[in-house]
Swiss-Prot record:
Name by which UniProt lists this protein: Innexin inx1
Entry GO MF terms: gap junction channel activity
Subunit architecture: Heterooligomer of Inx2 and ogre.
Membrane topology: Multi-pass membrane protein
Gene behind this protein: ogre
TM region(s), chain numbering: 29-49, 111-131, 178-198, 268-288
Annotated keywords: Cell junction, Cell membrane, Gap junction, Ion channel, Ion transport, Membrane, Transmembrane, Transmembrane helix, Transport
Location within or outside the cell: Cell membrane; Cell junction, Gap junction; Basolateral cell membrane
Source domain of life: Eukaryota
Tissues in which the protein is found: In ovary, expressed in follicle cells. Expressed around the periphery of the embryo during cellular blastoderm formation. Repeating epidermal pattern emerges from stage 11, high levels of expression detected along the borders of each segment from stage 13. At stage 13, expressed in the dorsal branch of the tracheal system. During stage 15, detected in a few cells at each of the branch points of the dorsal trunk and at low levels in cardioblasts. In embryos, also expressed in the salivary gland and the hindgut (at protein level). At stage 17, expressed in the dorsal side of the CNS.
Species per Swiss-Prot/TrEMBL record: Drosophila melanogaster
Family to which the UniProt record says this protein belongs: Belongs to the pannexin family.
Chief site of localization: membrane
InterPro entries: Innexin
Amino acid sequence: MYKLLGSLKSYLKWQDIQTDNAVFRLHNSFTTVLLLTCSLIITATQYVGQPISCIVNGVPPHVVNTFCWIHSTFTMPDAFRRQVGREVAHPGVANDFGDEDAKKYYTYYQWVCFVLFFQAMACYTPKFLWNKFEGGLMRMIVMGLNITICTREEKEAKRDALLDYLIKHVKRHKLYAIRYWACEFLCCINIIVQMYLMNRFFDGEFLSYGTNIMKLSDVPQEQRVDPMVYVFPRVTKCTFHKYGPSGSLQKHDSLCILPLNIVNEKTYVFIWFWFWILLVLLIGLIVFRGCIIFMPKFRPRLLNASNRMIPMEICRSLSRKLDIGDWWLIYMLGRNLDPVIYKDVMSEFAKQVEPSKHDRAK
């Protein structure tokens, strides 16, 4: 278990060459590791421990445990509003009086570990696609200029090679930028779709799960319906049928304890809060990208903010002469180059790059 969790550390290592931003990494790396960790913990609890334990007379316990785990257990929703110890033995546990429509069945618990695993894979997909699209371009053109451990002659040679690449490949990076922004947009779509599917998975209880917990946090336990216990009940019921000695059908009503749901309820509280935080960050990021794309006057200020050593005149000149793809490339270069080298390269690049058609028309 510890070895499996330790192997996830590699996904959180600092990147010496950055081709994305912090929010993108939070979605692709941190959330992937978070979901995989939750999946491993629940898997260990489910298959190493005892996920269900049922009380019943006249039937071997392991038979009932296996049956109720494979099929499903249920509660009576109206019993959650009754006082425990007086009206009901446990929250949601009461006589069903043969009313099948009044029962709330729980079938999700055996699938939680698999669902979390596939959620993790879905969160990693944008990073996988971007790595394929990017193809190591940034690392190739940086050529180690992000570190200072090289001779002066070597620095100058690499700087000239970088400048030569930028001049020869003007107007060839629009697809590079579009693919990255598409991957960022995919992150936002992924979170929205996952939240919708989780809400369906938990019968419409996920989207309001965290807010219900916060609303009732100050209400005494005996005066409220605990949302965590309602969505992840710790004690449920299960009906087991078998044939008696004479062939008559016998019904056995069992009380089942689900210790796994204690882990599930805490896991999904954290996931609920994290997904909402991540969704807000991703929406803000998309709005920010929209400002970059549709507000050209915003680009010089952003370029200058990334490296204060570059004069605003040079930032304006580059933003005016370059299309959005080339501008994005030099903006990302600022995160990967030594600031002094970056200033020299951008100053020389601004002198040598030809103005765009729009700029010449002016």
